[in-house]
Swiss-Prot record:
Naturally occurring in which organism (per UniProt): Homo sapiens
Lineage: Eukaryota, Metazoa, Chordata, Craniata, Vertebrata
Keyword annotations: Acetylation, Amino-acid biosynthesis, Aminotransferase, Branched-chain amino acid biosynthesis, Disease variant, Lipid metabolism, Mitochondrion, Pyridoxal phosphate, Transferase, Transit peptide
Xref: PANTHER family: BRANCHED-CHAIN-AMINO-ACID AMINOTRANSFERASE, MITOCHONDRIAL, SUBGROUP IIII AMINOTRANSFERASE
Protein name per UniProt: Branched-chain-amino-acid aminotransferase, mitochondrial
Name of the gene this protein is made from: BCAT2
EC number annotated for this UniProt entry: 2.6.1.42
Subunit structure: Homodimer.
Length: 392
């Protein structure tokens, strides 16, 4: 599909972007073009994983990558080239000051052998917003998506077709200023790499996780950058994840503020399915107030639930005090995280102030989680046609 043809899709999907945040040279009209894409096929193809061979997340890469360079004169020609190491100046601003951002999305191969991306325009919107926040160069989202489509098309034989598998797509944009000054970069590099990945829950099982909720650790704050997908948001979480493991938990429930608001689970958005204090059954997730990353799966679950019209769907602050009270009164049905890697992940225990809180997610089916997973699978693998899927 040519880039120009994507305009009809974007007319329905486009989100507002602060185009002028970093000055006029960041206008999207100054962009690389998919029509200029250069192609260099590898002469040394990698060995593809065999049938049934485990696909560990982020460990196996396809034969090719997309690369586009930028300087203060504009974007260079995009090129698909053999997968290779990068050459960076030791003073590169991405290495010293975390002038870097990334995205994560998946392509799925259906039984019809058609490969489809899941709502990629939302990732393009979010990536551009992240670029604006870091004063990195803007780009035309249509052109980048078409370049990504072409890359996947080149490496389409790497897209696994076993149940629950997919091709993970990782676009990255970094500042590449060869200087130790903290400033707006005059050089940047955009690249995209691909990884075949296995099922998050092997065999279709649903395994719940336990969470450490410690208010001493804060992932993001109002006025910060928690709502952008920046590399600098993730590195500091590794220590807290290790602390969770030491305390017998698999993930971290990130709290915020003096009232201990629930924000995210690990790198996932969080949902609570309960009967609210007013007696109404509802699905609630924290609002996009600058602390929450606007997840693609998060938005998809909200959209699906709104379409069903069977219970109230709301974006509202949730505090630990409210959750504790709801647990004591038996009003909580399910708590779960959502994200590109896992889609929907149930929670069965929260360690909070040295107290283990049992979450009855699994005792309740988990009815809603399984329904979400079933619908997502049918859409992503082309079992039923849906406007969310973008054919490669």
């Amino acid at each position: 599909m040519a880039a120009a043809a994507l305009g009809q899709i974007w007319a329905r999907k486009l989100l507002s972007v602060p185009w002028l945040l970093c000055g006029p040279r960041r206008y999207a009209s100054s962009s690389f073009k998919a029509a200029d894409l250069q192609l260099e096929m590898t002469q040394k193809p990698h060995k593809k994983p065999g049938p049934g061979e485990p696909l560990v997340f982020g460990k196996t890469f396809t034969d090719h990558m997309l690369m586009v360079e930028w300087n203060d004169k504009g974007w260079g020609q995009p090129r698909i080239q053999p997968f290779q190491n990068l050459t960076l100046h030791p003073a590169s601003s991405s290495l010293h000051y975390s002038l870097q951002l990334f995205e994560g999305m998946k392509a799925f191969k259906g039984k019809d052998q058609q490969v489809r991306l899941f709502r990629p325009w939302l990732n393009m919107d979010r990536m551009l917003r992240s670029a604006m926040r870091l004063c990195l160069p803007s780009f035309d989202k249509l052109e980048l998506l078409e370049c990504i489509r072409r890359l996947i098309e080149v490496d389409k034989d790497w897209v696994p077709d076993a149940a629950g598998t997919s091709l993970y797509v990782r676009p990255v944009l970094i500042g590449n200023e060869p200087s130790l000054g903290v400033s707006q970069p005059t050089r940047a590099l955009l690249f995209v790499i691909l990884c075949p990945v296995g099922a998050y829950f092997p065999g279709g099982s649903v395994t719940p996780v336990s969470l450490l909720a410690d208010p001493a650790f804060i992932r993001a704050w109002v006025g910060g950058v928690g709502n952008y997908k920046l590399g600098g948001n993730y590195g500091p979480t590794v220590l807290v994840q290790q602390e969770a493991l030491k305390r017998g938990c698999e993930q971290v429930l990130w709290l915020y503020g003096p009232d201990h608001q629930l924000t995210e689970v690990g790198t996932m958005n969080i949902f609570v399915y309960w009967t609210h204090e007013d007696g109404v059954l509802e699905l609630v997730t924290p609002p996009l107030n600058g602390v929450i990353l606007p997840g693609v799966v998060r938005q998809s679950l909200l959209d699906m639930a709104q379409t069903w019209g069977e219970f109230r769907v709301v974006e509202r602050t949730i505090t630990m005090k409210q959750l504790l009270r709801a647990l004591e009164e038996g009003r909580v049905r399910e708590v779960f995280g959502s994200g590109t890697a896992c889609q929907v992940c149930p929670v069965h225990r929260i360690l909070y102030k040295d107290r283990n809180l049992h979450i009855p997610t699994m005792e309740n089916g988990p009815e809603l989680i399984l329904r979400f997973q079933k619908e997502l699978k049918e859409i992503q693998y082309g079992i039923r046609a849906h406007e969310w899927m973008f054919p490669v």
